[in-house]
Design a protein with these regions (language model features):
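Basic, polar low-complexity surface loops/patches
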Residues: 2-113
Length: 113
């Protein structure tokens, strides 16, 4: 179990990265799976229709973020077909193809996500 201070720092890192995220998918290792939050989760749902975002509630911080969870097997298949910019044992950063950025903004405004 992580100390409370570390959990707060991790959530702050996620929020800081996601606030104006228009071109990346940030993935975080959580136990035996990976998670994408907020704009990263929306990017995943746009690029890969098999992913579904859900509202993840952080009661201690009174915040709700969109979230997509991926198994290790899913992440292996996903990474084969994407451009991983940064990969570490507990985090990944994936660039969104330039040609998809404008399509994403249109999709997002159409579906209100």
């Amino acid at each position: 179990v992580k100390p409370l201070k570390m959990i707060i720092m991790d959530l702050e890192k996620v929020l800081f990265r996601e606030i104006d995220n228009k071109s990346r998918i940030f993935l975080y290792k959580e136990g035996d799976c990976w998670s994408a939050h907020d704009n990263s989760a929306r990017h995943l749902c746009f690029l890969y229709s098999q992913f579904n975002a859900f509202d993840r509630i952080y009661h201690a911080y009174e915040i709700v973020l969109k979230c997509v969870m991926l198994s290790n097997a899913m992440i292996e298949k996903f990474v084969e077909h994407t451009l991983v910019q940064t990969g570490r044992a507990d985090e990944m950063e994936i660039s969104i193809p330039e040609e998809k950025k404008a399509e994403f903004e249109s999709w997002r405004s159409t579906f209100g996500v």
